[in-house]
Amino acid sequence: MLRDPGTMWHTVVGQRICETGHLIQTDPFSFTQQGQAWIAQQWLGECAMAVIHHFAGLDGLVLWAAVILAGTFAFLAGRFMRAGLQWPAAAILLVLVIAASSYHFIPRPHLVTILLLTLVTALLCDVEAGRVSMRRLLWLPPLFVLWTNIHGGALGGIATVFLVQMAWLLRGVPEKLGPSEITHLWHRRPAGGETGETPVPQVNPVLIATSLSLCFVAVLVNPYGTALPRVWLSLMHSDLLPRIMIEHAPLRFLSTEGVMILTLAAVYLGLLAATWRRGLRVTWLVPLVWLVLACSRVRHGPLFAVTAAVAIADMLPHSPLPAIFARSGSTLLDPARAAEAVGLRVMAVPALLVALVFGVQTAGIRCPLIGAGWCRLDPSYWPVEATKVLREHLAAQPEDRRVFNDMLFGGYLIYNAPEARVYIDDRCELYRDSGLSRYLELRDHPERIEGLSGNAAPRLALVRSRSQLRRYLEGSPQWSELHRDPTASLFVRKPD
């Protein structure tokens, strides 16, 4: 889980906010953008990470990431079993959902987006099915205030709510005008094969309009005002991000995550097709939107997975599958034996266990898996040894703090070498396409590093040992090698 630089620099941002009592408004970490406007768009999540790190370090961050994920998938498992799936079948389906999401299990604020989108989709399903009152939609605006200040995935959540509620409003128009083929799409027939249709709950346009309006206003309830959603939109429109960051790249269908996502998509689409003739609900179509987004940017894959899981659980009792299982004598899917909803009391034991583990970590007690010091950064992936040499060099020559670095190493240096100033890191909204393009040029044409001058000229270079940059710097008369290991190499520019 500790293979993403965001885990580290997000924590440092939260530490600075907590220590100073002020939000960050300009870049404090790089020498290429120093003093330029930059907002900590995930400030609340970053502060939470800083507090956890203060008490339990990286162990605590991994623990609470696991807690968020465990809570999300336990919630989904509960919905599967309340739909009539018995635990063996629910476990198999849950494993598929986890497999389609696991490549993005990283201790970062985006995990909250996975959890909250799951809850929002479930709420929309419950409202449309009539299981809860439509007044529950008024819970969404305060939820989006919290979500907005934790992670930009709130934009996707609001888009989901907007699409569903607008479809509900549009559904009401043909119903008032009279029967039509469109009307039949928004009704469901009972699964028992009875004729006739049972309409979904009556739409309340005033309540929907109020909920939607407050959700949009909720996005502006943040310390940065309209600047925050503008940053989200700028990241969506970047043409370079898919080239430079794997999580923004299109889904590779033959990759492990691609196969898992497509397998889950096949299950979802097959169930949707089988249930379609019995009636259709708007919320059952939500995963289609996220599937398209996942194909365009792989980072959306977990969001497709959790919305698909919620929709599958909602569709199962209305599909032909219960009758098919009954005819075969199987009880793996039997809505009549659906599990009862559990109360908050069942969470007491897991909560106590989490508190116990966090207490062990906070106390610094060393023991396998749950103790302090168990989580370490992999020196075969991160420049652990090279950074030690870099810090020793900066202690002797602090004026050399401008470091050209591989983009992957930027967040690591921000966390582990705070006295250094990086050339780039993965805060792409700060560097914009122009800065990302310059980095790509230097990466692909290492000789151009000699053209950097003035405040843009690095004094040190920390690059991957198997990169073109390392090979160029090794042969350049302008640079001298200070350290090399299989992971990273450190160079210093020779005096003019």
Describe each PLM feature range.
Residues 120-136, 202, 268-275:
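Membrane-interface transmembrane helices that cradle and orient dolichyl/undecaprenyl
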Residues 325-395, 408-410, 428, 440, ...:
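Membrane-proximal, lumen/periplasm-facing interface regions of secretory-pathway glyco-
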Residues 63-83:
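Transmembrane-helix motifs of polytopic, lipid-linked glycan transferases
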Residues 392-433, 454, 458-465, 491:
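Short periplasmic/luminal acceptor-recognition loop of GT-C membrane glycosyltransferases, typified by
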Residues 40-50, 230-263:
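Juxtamembrane membrane-water interface segments that cap and precede transmembrane helices
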Residues 76-99, 114:
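Transmembrane-helix signature of polytopic, membrane-embedded enzymes
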Residues 97-101, 136-152, 214-219, 288-294:
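Membrane-interface alpha helices of multi-pass inner-membrane proteins
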Residues 126-145, 206-210, 284-287:
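Short hydrophobic alpha-helices at membrane interfaces in multi-pass membrane enzymes
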